UniProtKB/Swiss-Prot annotation:
Tissue expression notes: Predominantly detected in bud, stem, root, flower, silique, and leaves, and enhanced dramatically in senescence leaf.
GO BP of this protein: response to abscisic acid; response to mannitol; response to salt stress; response to water deprivation
GO molecular function, one term: kinase binding
Biased composition (Polar residues): 61-71, 145-156
Superkingdom assignment: Eukaryota
Gene: REM4.2
Location(s), subcellular: Cell membrane
Family indicated by similarity: Belongs to the remorin family.
Post-translational modification: Probably ubiquitinated and degraded by the 26S proteasome pathway.
Name this protein carries in UniProt: Remorin 4.2
Biological function: Collaborates with REM4.1 to positively regulate the BCTV and BSCTV susceptibility.
Amino acid sequence: MLTLYHQERSPDATSNDRDETPETVVREVHALTPAPEDNSRTMTATLPPPPAFRGYFSPPRSATTMSEGENFTTISREFNALVIAGSSMENNELMTRDVTQREDERQDELMRIHEDTDHEEETNPLAIVPDQYPGSGLDPGSDNGPGQSRVGSTVQRVKREEVEAKITAWQTAKLAKINNRFKREDAVINGWFNEQVNKANSWMKKIERKLEERKAKAMEKTQNNVAKAQRKAEERRATAEAKRGTEVAKVVEVANLMRALGRPPAKRSFFSFS
């Protein structure tokens, strides 16, 4: 077998080198217990090389081999310590998880018992619901541990949410009732208003019809009065025209008579007796 310096080595040296190679040892993990070292391995590490190859092995190389073995032992111990610490942390987490789970189960059982012994639910939305039930042991002021306080605060929060839900439902129902009543009243008011408007329009149309009838009658009467006045005026005009014609004829006749006699008209006429 060839070495680092291209020299052949004997099978004995090869077997010695194989002995120097660290073996994989399967050990059980114990609390900080160092693993027993192999005597053959220690002896192999301390044996000198064969005489034929003593010139090729220097003292620093042997010292390096020994320091590597010590470093490997130290690393193995540190690895074992890390494995033990990790396993202990996992065990602690598992134990903590189991304790928390058992505590939650116990709290669930207490809550179920509390629900079984709970009083009848109040259906009145205006009822005052107490924050705590007497004798239930859920008083936050009592010193029963953080788990009991957490359960008490949870129960109080649930009660507050229930009361708030009831108040919200009552408020919604009341507002809906008020809004529906207002809508009905608004519909009634709108109907009454429309009725009054229709009644006023009907009265106005009736008055307009009466006014049209009266206007027609007044127009007819006016036309009759105008026609009558026109007839009377024509009669009076005819009478005045006839009188004027008669007087003109008298004056012409007197004037002709005076011309015939040759006498001028006197201050007081003979024919004027008035």
